[in-house]
A protein has these predicted regions:
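N-terminal cap/lid segment of alpha/beta-hydrolase-fold proteins
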Residues: 55-56, 60, 97-149
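Short beta-strand element of the alpha/beta-hydrolase
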Residues: 148-159
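Alpha/beta-hydrolase active-site loop
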Residues: 166, 173, 195-220
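Hydrolase active-site cap/lid region
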Residues: 236-291, 308
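Short beta-strand/loop motif that positions the catalytic acidic residue
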Residues: 306-307, 312-314, 318
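Conserved alpha/beta-hydrolase "acid-adjacent" motif
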Residues: 319-325
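Catalytic histidine neighborhood in serine/cysteine hydrolases
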Residues: 331-348
């Protein structure tokens, strides 16, 4: 197991960067704190009986039992299923390198499938052909009896340590805003049959965008939203996919994050996630470093081709993606973007997740559906 950083450091990083988002999505802070105190975290002995993966797997199972009770209302069952999906995802992160983590991901997918009937919107699995493989996506659609035209559509993707099921909480906000949403795994994560490769090599995202455009959704009303490495792909696709009308980039690496100096400083958690996504031995991050240097968006795409609205978000104290990468999009790429920087916050601004996430979704709705799509007087530059 990767252990070049102390266990205490890794657990503190987890508490700082992940706990605020998990709590906002329904996790109990007390249980998270107890898990940190009792386990070695997701990197150290996670499969032992009282290890991280095993503990959260049991929590998810308990919630599933409660969610299946016919005595509960539909809203109660939906909430319990969502929290089970959350806990199974926590058990799995940041990669499926152990048997219990792989089991946790299997249960997360099963929980998501079982919960579809109780969600207040339609969700179905989509298989998008690409070569001899399929892109697996979760397609969300609002239930709007009076809707005459198909809704706006958003392609949603996460980073190296999350799955499309983990992105359910953002997807549910998107669909509640009246938009359709296709959530897919970043290559190298979840059910993706591809490994992480630079733009120009990977055709996964352009294919998913064309699929959305071809479903009958207005090709002039398609957006893309990504968190972490998913933000990287939002920017790359904005420069290369003419179907997109707006993109949101939250915490995406752009250029300086791919420097040798920055990559060498990455915590073990992210080393494991990136190595796994690229198909390398998780214990040998040096191979990944040698390749990641070629991912800079200043080298792989022409950012000057971006002509759609861009919203970039991050915390100023991000230890994973230097805050300079948020500004370099405009300074070096010449992109006119809105910038939401949260002072003192970390990677993807987790302490302000409850603020930026719904606002960013509303921003997207207004950009691809019209300024009055979701009236929000507070949608102003921070």
């Amino acid at each position: 197991m990767i252990a070049d950083r102390s266990k205490d450091y890794e657990l503190q990083l987890l508490a700082t960067e992940k706990f605020p988002v998990w709590e906002a999505n329904g996790a109990e802070g007390r249980l998270l704190e107890e898990a940190v105190a009792r386990t070695g975290g997701p990197l150290f002995w996670p499969d032992e009986r009282n290890g991280w993966a095993s503990v959260f797997l049991r929590m998810g199972d308990q919630l599933m039992d409660r969610a299946r009770s016919p005595a509960r209302s539909g809203d109660e069952r939906a909430s319990l299923y969502e929290t089970a999906i959350l806990y199974f995802g926590i058990a799995r992160l940041p990669a499926t390198e152990t048997p219990v983590k792989r089991e946790a991901y299997g249960r997360q997918k099963a929980a998501f499938s079982e919960a579809r009937d109780v969600f207040p919107f339609d969700v179905r699995q989509e298989l998008i052909p690409l070569g001899d493989k399929d892109i697996v996506g979760n397609y969300y659609e609002p239930r709007q009896e009076k809707e005459i035209t198909r809704p706006e559509a958003v392609l949603l993707t996460g980073g190296a340590d999350v799955t499309k099921e983990d992105m359910h909480f953002i997807a549910s906000r998107i669909v509640r805003d009246g938009m359709a949403c296709l959530a897919i795994d970043m290559p190298g994560t979840g059910e993706s049959e591809w490994k992480l490769q630079p733009p120009g090599v990977s055709a996964v995202y352009p294919r998913a965008i064309k699929y959305l455009a071809g479903r009958g959704d207005d090709p002039n009303r398609i957006g893309m939203m990504g968190t972490g490495f998913g933000g990287y792909w939002s920017l790359a696709c904005a420069a290369t996919c003419p179907e997109l009308s707006a993109v949101v980039n939250c915490g995406g690496p752009v250029h300086r994050a791919f420097s040798h100096e920055s990559l060498k400083k990455l915590p073990a958690y992210y080393r494991l996630a990136l190595s796994s996504a690229m198909g390398h031995d998780p214990a040998d991050f040096e191979k990944a470093i040698g390749l990641l240097g070629d991912y800079s968006l200043l080298r792989t795409v022409d950012l000057r081709r971006i002509a759609v609205p861009v919203l970039s978000i991050n915390g100023t104290d991000d230890p994973i993606v230097p805050i300079e990468d948020l500004f370099i999009v405009a300074e070096e790429g010449g992109v006119r973007q809105e910038e939401w920087e949260f002072r003192g916050d970390s990677h993807c601004a987790p302490r302000h997740y409850g603020e930026w996430m719904p606002r960013a979704v509303d921003w997207m709705a207004n950009k691809i559906g019209g300024q009055e799509r979701v009236p929000r007087p507070d949608l102003a530059k921070l």
